[in-house]
Amino acid sequence: YKVNADSGKDKEISDELSGYLERLLKIAKDSEGAFDPTIGKLIRLWDIGGENQKIPEEAEIKNVLKDSGYQKVSLDGTTIHMDEGCSLDLGAAGKGIGCDSILEYLETQKDVSAALMNLGGSSVMTYGSKPDGSSWNVAVTDPRAENDDDYLGVVALNGTEFLSTSGDYEKYFIEDGVRYHHIMDPSTGYPAKSGVTGVTVVCDTGLEADALSTACFVLGVEKGAELLKTYGADGLFVDEDHHVYLTEGMKERFSLLADSYSVEDIIE
């Protein structure tokens, strides 16, 4: 909040925050802005999942978008400069950052050899190997499930890995038959319309898994899969027609459970 309050000025930040922002800004650039940590004002304007959620006026959206854009943030070591009016929001990577912090802690605990951590369902991390050597199995939500215990399938994690899911079913409201969800397309100022309903990413760091799942939701299947390649991450995309698209690495991890879905190849 202090950083946002001091937009337009140079501000000293911690080494830790600087490191996180450097990684997030790289993902923003690599995704051509599909992930953007500067859309805080836009997220607050829609307030989806909050008490004041609404469809904003077009003029309101344009007004907050002029203050958005990852290019408005520059880092020089631990000195940050944001254009005046720019507002950071790290919510799209918050759980992933939390997972990375947990890993740092676990690595200092000599009496902990293995663990599975669930941060609210959308972010999961595994640490070490199970005693019997088998994979950790993590259920993935069916984006259109009628019951909470209806799962799309299971993803196998091995050793220390991070899984993040972004979907249009987590926070949303429906007005005039249209679903307005919380994952914003920074280029339009509206909820992303890429044809996907859910994306799951497996990566070797929590921050990247979290931010990449958001970026891939905005980008859609083909562009999202290309982005994951550059990070050596595995991905699963669910579209509106009940198709599941798997990257090569995810094919070895994923087992489909939901009968109403079919697995398709990604067209490259």
Which residue ranges define each predicted feature?
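Mature catalytic core of soluble alpha/beta enzymes
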Residues: Y1-E268
